[in-house]
């Protein structure tokens, strides 16, 4: 079974690894298509996608392609690889009909479709406080995440997970699901999506990390969803790190400092309160909340803003 894999971030790398290391289904990954290396950090040094790094670090004999677009000659390159399947996981590009026609294109999408079509389904699960998390394999068509569902898997939330932890769990679940889908592809009954039930999620931007002390639960969920990037910050760009939801009922002044101790600062919201362990001002290192407040001469009863 010849597989061309299209994927870019760490989520995709987990699934690529499962395909490469799988010994049962006679799977051969014959090519990786991934995004181009991108400038990263203050020094803007080029950083390779995690999928590419995995192949290079393990010295795998898998050709890597990083095209700007998926037109010719890339279409012919794909044809020459003679794939039985094209697997797409968080690739970051829309596949044109010329590529969809080469072989069945299976997408691993981190939601229970038709819910959360688009670029940020895992963020949306967290932000919407979903009780059930899930993942789907889908036969791709020309529209965004609208193809027939092949298989899906889900689990009941037992505890709050941040983006990294939930992504990793769903990636491993997605790897198992994909292996099942590939093995059973020709006997699976495809399930058309109910497009009337579709919901969509947008690409996350820096501005999404802006928070205020209105709703404690909402602030806490944002801290989980945006932990890696863009993180959460106040209007003065003060970052709030390691946030815990304390309660979500009582009403306080917005940003009122209720308690300061070694664990952090307890801050009141219009609804509820949160404990913040660390605070980070622009261009500064993170400080324990207690030390930051001491430096600003903020005490209980004051306002964190």
Curated annotation (Swiss-Prot):
Residues annotated for (6S)-5,6,7,8-tetrahydrofolate binding in this entry: 111-114
Gene Ontology CC, one term: cytosol
Pfam family of the protein (one): Formyl_trans_N
Signal peptide (from-to): none
InterPro entries associated with the record: Fmt, Formyl_trans_C, Formyl_transf_N, Formyl_transf_N_sf, Formyl_transferase-like_C_sf, Met-tRNA-FMT_C, Met-tRNA-FMT_N
GO molecular function annotation: methionyl-tRNA formyltransferase activity
CDD domains: FMT_core_Met-tRNA-FMT_N, Met_tRNA_FMT_C
Keyword flag Transferase: yes
Keyword field: Protein biosynthesis, Transferase
Protein origin, superkingdom: Bacteria
Catalytic activity reported: L-methionyl-tRNA(fMet) + (6R)-10-formyltetrahydrofolate = N-formyl-L-methionyl-tRNA(fMet) + (6S)-5,6,7,8-tetrahydrofolate + H(+)
Record EC number: 2.1.2.9
Family: Belongs to the Fmt family.
Record function comment: Attaches a formyl group to the free amino group of methionyl-tRNA(fMet). The formyl group appears to play a dual role in the initiator identity of N-formylmethionyl-tRNA by promoting its recognition by IF2 and preventing the misappropriation of this tRNA by the elongation apparatus.
Listed name of the protein: Methionyl-tRNA formyltransferase
Organism: Helicobacter pylori (strain P12)
């Amino acid at each position: 079974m010849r597989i061309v894999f299209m994927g870019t971030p760490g989520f995709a790398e987990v699934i690529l690894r499962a395909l490469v290391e799988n010994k049962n289904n006679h799977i051969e990954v014959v090519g990786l298509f991934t995004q181009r290396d991108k400038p990263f950090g203050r020094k803007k040094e080029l950083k390779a996608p995690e999928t590419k790094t995995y192949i290079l670090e393990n010295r795998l004999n898998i050709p890597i392609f990083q095209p700007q677009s998926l037109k010719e000659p890339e279409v012919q390159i794909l044809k020459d690889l003679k794939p039985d399947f094209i697997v797409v996981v968080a690739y970051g590009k829309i596949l044109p009909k010329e590529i969809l026609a080469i072989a069945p294109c299976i997408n691993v999408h981190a939601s229970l479709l038709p819910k959360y079509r688009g670029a940020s389904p895992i963020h949306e699960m967290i932000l919407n406080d979903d009780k059930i998390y899930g993942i789907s394999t889908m036969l791709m068509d020309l529209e965004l995440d609208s193809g027939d569902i092949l298989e899906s898997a889900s689990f009941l939330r037992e505890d709050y997970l941040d983006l990294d932890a939930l992504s990793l769990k769903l990636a491993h679940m997605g790897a198992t699901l994909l292996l099942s889908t590939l093995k059973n592809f020709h006997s699976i009954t495809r399930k058309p999506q109910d497009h009337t039930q579709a919901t969509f999620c947008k690409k996350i931007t820096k501005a999404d990390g802006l928070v205020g002390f209105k709703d404690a639960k909402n602030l806490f969920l944002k801290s989980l969803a945006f932990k890696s990037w863009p993180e959460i910050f106040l209007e003065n760009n003060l970052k709030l790190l390691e946030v815990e939801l304390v309660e979500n009922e009582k009403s306080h002044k917005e940003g009122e400092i209720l308690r300061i101790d070694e664990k952090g600062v307890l801050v009141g919201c219009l609804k509820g309160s949160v404990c913040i362990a660390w605070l980070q001002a622009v261009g500064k290192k993170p400080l324990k909340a207690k030390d930051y407040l001491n430096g600003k001469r903020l005490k209980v009863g004051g306002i964190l803003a």
